[in-house]
Amino acid sequence: MKPYKDQQIIIDDILNEFAYRNRIMLQLPTGAGKTAVFSFIAKRFIKDYKKKVLVLAHREELVNQTLATLRDIGVSCESIIASKKTLKHNANAYVGMIQTLKNRLRSNPLFVKEIELVICDEAHLDIFKEVFEYFPNAKILAVTATPSSLKKVNFTRCHRCKKEYDTITECCNYETY
C-alpha cells in the first residue's frame, strides 16, 4: 500500500509543519483517505524521529480500521482496549478509544510512555481535548472532515479551532478516490 500522489503531498506538508508547530488540525473531506493519510504520517514520524505514536478514535470500528491500516503499511502497533490491562512497550504505535485511554491515564498517567505524536481521528469532537494535558510536549495532529459543527463555516477562521491548534490545514480541493 502506498499513498496517492495528492496524499503524499499532504503527508509531506504536515510533517514539515511539525518542525514549526505543535498542534495541527487537518481537514480532509469524506472519502479522501483520512486513515491512510494519518497512518502514513505516523509511519514517517516513527521512522524519522524514532518516537512512538498514539492514535485515538471514538468508535471501535475506527480503532480496528486504523490498526489494520497501520499493520498493512508495516507499523508495529497495539490496541488499547478495556480488556487489555498491560501493553507491550516494544510497539511503535498504540491505537485506542478515547474513553479507554482517559480511564487508563486517570489511574496511571505513565500508562503510555514515550509518546511524541498524538493523532486524533474525528477530532471535531470535544472529547479529545481532555487528553492533550497528558501529552504537553507531544505533537498533536487532529484529523477531521468537519472541524466545526456549524454549517458553511470557514474553518481557518473558526475561533474554537484557532484557539486549540497552531495551524489548520484545509484540503478542500482534494480529489477523492
Regions found by a protein language model. Give the residues of each.
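Conserved pre-motif I regulatory segment
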Residues: 1-27
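Alpha-helical elements of the RecA-like P-loop NTPase motor core of helicases
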Residues: 12, 64, 103, 129
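Walker A/P-loop
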Residues: 20-43, 144
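Inter-Walker segment of RecA-like/P-loop motor cores
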Residues: 70-106
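SF2 helicase catalytic motif II
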Residues: 98-100, 107-149
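Interdomain hinge/linker at the junction between the two RecA-like core domains of SF2 helicases
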Residues: 154-177
